[in-house]
């Protein structure tokens, strides 16, 4: 006898093909579907006699990489500070903020100007780090059993964090005001809370002048010198306080001799008056 292979009917072949497809869906590493959730939905639709269609959507990125990817934290805010200030003073014919920042960074003579933003950004970061470190140290010293104290300290940490943010905003606001006044008047203000042993008034003035001449190609007028009154001694002040014309008239009056006065007697002779 000759073994003749059994021929499958079209219906049987379709069922086998579907079974292979379902097995592939369950075992494939590329299938990112939630099969348990899919089975629940299909069973529900089957019980309710509702027609359904399964659609396949490609996943553009690997889900594992998406879950492991952490949010990028930008610690360097120099450009953010520069952009916030530059966009307020920018003229239509000037380069855009990103182009100007690239130009400023690539110019060696503008290194001091970039340092201004770097130093200010570090000051703001120190304020944030100070509040974060203090809150973490307080939380580490709390026993696990004292939940009420934990809530109180958490509220205190939130208040401290809020205060730190307000101080940093105030720092940046005064920093922008300092740059605007220096840019408009070609000289830094006499007093500012931004000044320290590094960022001095002379340093800010010279750095802004370099930015205007090198980056913006603007003519910088000489800074207006502040008027300081010269102290005057008391005797000299009294002498110079009287006008020259008045002094001459006083001298003339002193040299003039007063005329002699003629005195007339009040005694009158007796006239022909009756007794």
Swiss-Prot record:
A Pfam family annotated for this chain is Baculo_PP31
Key word Phosphoprotein present: yes
**Disulfide feature:** none
**A GO CC annotation given for this chain:** virogenic stroma
For this UniProt entry, the molecular function terms from Gene Ontology, in alphabetical order, are: DNA binding
InterPro entries on file: Baculo_pp39
What biological function has been recorded for the protein in this entry? Plays a role in both early and late gene expression.
Q: Report the protein name in the record.
A: Protein pp31
Q: Which organism is it from?
A: Autographa californica nuclear polyhedrosis virus
């Amino acid at each position: 006898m000759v073994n003749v292979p059994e021929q499958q009917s079209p219906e049987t072949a379709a069922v086998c093909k579907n079974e292979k497809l379902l097995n592939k869906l369950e075992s494939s590493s590329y299938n990112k579907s939630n099969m348990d959730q899919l089975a629940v939905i299909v069973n529900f639709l089957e019980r309710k006699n509702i027609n359904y269609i399964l659609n396949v959507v490609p996943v553009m990125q690997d889900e594992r990489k998406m879950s492991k990817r952490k949010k990028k934290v930008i610690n360097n805010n120099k450009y953010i500070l520069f952009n916030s200030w530059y966009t307020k003073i920018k003229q239509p014919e000037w380069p855009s903020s990103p182009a100007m920042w690239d130009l400023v960074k690539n110019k060696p003579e503008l290194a001091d100007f970039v340092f201004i933003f770097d130093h200010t950004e570090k000051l703001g970061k120190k304020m944030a780090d100070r509040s974060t470190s203090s809150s973490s140290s307080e939380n580490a010293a709390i026993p696990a059993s004292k939940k009420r104290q934990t809530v109180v300290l958490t509220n205190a940490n939130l208040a401290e964090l809020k205060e730190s943010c307000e101080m940093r905003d105030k720092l940046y606001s005064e920093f922008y005001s300092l740059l605007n006044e220096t840019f408009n008047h070609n000289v830094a203000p006499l007093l500012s809370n931004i000044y320290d042993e590094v960022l001095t008034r002379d340093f800010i003035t010279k750095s802004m002048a370099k930015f205007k001449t090198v980056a913006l190609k603007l003519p910088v007028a000489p800074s207006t010198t502040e008027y300081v009154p010269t102290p005057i001694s008391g005797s000299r002040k009294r002498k110079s306080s009287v006008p020259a014309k008045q002094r001459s008239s006083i001298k003339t009056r002193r040299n003039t001799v007063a005329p002699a006065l003629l005195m007339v007697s009040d005694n009158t002779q007796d006239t022909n008056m009756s007794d």
